[in-house]
């Protein structure tokens, strides 16, 4: 509460008290006037000189009391008028302060609204930029996939149809074989999955590119073991490009496994892969991952 507001409350209390005091004096004044009228009437009826002098003295005393009450009423009226004037001035100040406070609150609200609108515009601009970047990335990926050509002769439809069907193709970097991929491949095969894995599927004299193309084309699912080693290799990335192309045509489905990498690292390599539901070797064992994969394969 401001000093002006406190002064207003004080003035209102003082005015109310003066009005109460004034009402009491007014009642006293009325009583004196009634007694004075009675004393005057008694003078007219007095039959002896002593009785007359007694009533005259009483009337004189009442007239003096009446003058005192009249003066008190006048003083109270003057005080009330002064305090009413002060109260009016304080109320004007209060109204001006309220007006200023409203203007300040409105200005603050406008500033907050402007800040929120600016933040919304920035978010929308960022979203549009991200959308354009994703579109550009997808277009570039399609161009690169279209530009890919076999280095060891074309892979024909006959090659693909003659290849035995596989449940899973494993794309990986060879550095990850020892600590994860080899155990994954053997556990999958032991669980009954048909696995295309280079150690299982390549024979001396086979064309590496043609064999991989056959494996890709004949597999229902493509496991991609994403690791720091994978990100640095050109050949696994070409396999991934081929899997993307097959997935876009509905012929295969990519199943990512994050091996000792974070989501930020995956997103830096491929935003599309970062958005896919993935298995993580940091949170699941080989047996647990294989159990989940077999559930997907058999679904």
UniProtKB/Swiss-Prot annotation:
EC number(s) on file: 3.2.2.6
PROSITE patterns named in the record: TIR
Catalytic activity annotation: NAD(+) + H2O = ADP-D-ribose + nicotinamide + H(+)
UniProt-annotated catalytic positions: 239
Residue ranges of domain TIR in the record: 164-297
Keywords of this entry: Hydrolase, NAD
UniProt-listed SMART domains: TIR (SM00255)
Enzyme class: hydrolase
GO biological process, one term: NAD catabolic process
Pfam families the UniProt entry points to: TIR_2
Top-rank lineage group of the source organism: Bacteria
A GO term for molecular function: NAD+ nucleosidase activity, cyclic ADP-ribose generating
Residues reported in the UniProt entry to bind NAD(+): 173-174, 203
InterPro entries found in the cross-reference section: TIR_dom, Toll_tir_struct_dom_sf
Function: NAD(+) hydrolase (NADase) that catalyzes cleavage of NAD(+) into ADP-D-ribose (ADPR) and nicotinamide.
Record's subunit section: Homodimer. Interacts with host MYD88.
Entry's free-text remark on domains: The TIR domain mediates NAD(+) hydrolase (NADase) activity. Self-association of TIR domains is required for NADase activity.
Protein name in the entry: NAD(+) hydrolase PdTIR
Organismal lineage: Bacteria, Pseudomonadati, Pseudomonadota, Alphaproteobacteria, Rhodobacterales
């Amino acid at each position: 509460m401001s000093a002006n507001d406190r002064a207003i409350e004080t003035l209102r209390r003082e005015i109310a008290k003066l009005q109460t005091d004034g009402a009491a004096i007014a009642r006293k004044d009325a009583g004196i006037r009634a007694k004075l009228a009675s004393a005057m009437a008694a003078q007219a009826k007095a039959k002896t000189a002593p009785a007359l002098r007694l009533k005259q003295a009483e009337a004189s005393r009442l007239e003096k009391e009446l003058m005192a009450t009249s003066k008190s009423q006048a003083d109270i009226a003057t005080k009330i008028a002064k305090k009413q004037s002060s109260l009016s001035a304080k109320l004007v100040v209060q109204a001006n302060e309220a007006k200023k406070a409203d203007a300040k609150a409105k200005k603050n609200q406008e500033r907050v609204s402007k800040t929120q609108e600016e933040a919304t515009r920035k978010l929308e601009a960022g979203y549009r930029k991200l959308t354009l970047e994703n579109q550009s990335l997808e277009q570039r990926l399609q161009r690169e996939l279209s530009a890919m050509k076999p280095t060891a002769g074309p892979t024909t439809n006959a090659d693909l149809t003659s290849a035995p069907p596989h449940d899973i193709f494993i794309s990986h970097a060879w550095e990850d074989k020892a600590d994860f991929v080899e155990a994954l491949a053997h556990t999958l095969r032991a669980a009954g999955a048909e696995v295309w894995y280079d150690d299982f599927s390549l024979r001396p004299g086979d064309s590496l590119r043609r064999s991989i193309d056959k494996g890709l084309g004949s597999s229902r699912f493509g496991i991609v073991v994403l690791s720091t080693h994978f990100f640095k290799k050109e050949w696994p990335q070409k396999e991934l490009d081929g899997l993307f192309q097959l997935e876009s045509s509905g012929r295969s489905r990519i199943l990512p496994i994050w091996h000792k990498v974070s989501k930020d690292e995956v997103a830096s390599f491929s935003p599309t892969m970062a958005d896919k539901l993935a298995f993580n070797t940091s949170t699941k064992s080989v047996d647990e991952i294989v159990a989940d994969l077999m559930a997907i394969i058999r679904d």
